[in-house]
């Protein structure tokens, strides 16, 4: 997948990738867990990043809810159901382009558990040719609305 600019359009969709939608709707949050389960059953990710992405996205959403912050995020991890030409905005995981409260959540997680969140281990990355600080779970923000049909196809395993 290659983007022309920081805010660009998907030129080519890669195979065997998963779209995870994060929204304020609880149904969408349940869909994230289900999509991770389906993909892990298929064995598409032997190293577990996909499961970590879902688990920690959910924990991050809970962290935001406790602070009264909105949870209308869209997380894109390895998606084959994106359409060419879809406009996206990408950011690094955790530290700079996503949000400061994600960074605080990772600090809290590390303090409480004694370990770094698996999806953000320092030895991960770089990914998709981004700079060396882009590690772990890659977060994309999709500006176009993702249709219900795409979510349904993913949930049905198509």
Give names to the regions the model predicted.
Residues 1-158:
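Short, Lys/Arg-rich flexible segments
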């Amino acid at each position: 997948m290659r983007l022309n600019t920081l805010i660009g359009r998907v030129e080519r969709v890669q195979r065997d990738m998963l779209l995870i939608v994060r929204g304020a709707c609880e149904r969408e949050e349940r869909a994230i867990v289900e999509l991770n389960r389906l993909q892990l059953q298929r064995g598409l990710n032997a190293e577990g990043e996909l499961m970590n992405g879902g688990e920690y996205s959910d924990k991050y959403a809970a962290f935001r809810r406790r602070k009264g912050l909105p949870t209308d995020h869209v997380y894109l991890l390895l998606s084959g159901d994106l359409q060419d030409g879809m406009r996206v905005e990408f950011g690094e995981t955790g530290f700079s382009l996503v949000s400061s409260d994600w960074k605080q959540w990772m600090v809290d997680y590390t303090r409480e558990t004694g370990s770094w969140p698996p999806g953000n281990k320092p030895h991960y990355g770089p990914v998709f040719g981004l700079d060396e600080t882009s590690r772990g779970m890659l977060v994309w923000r999709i500006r176009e609305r993702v249709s219900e049909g795409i979510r349904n196809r993913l949930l049905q395993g198509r």
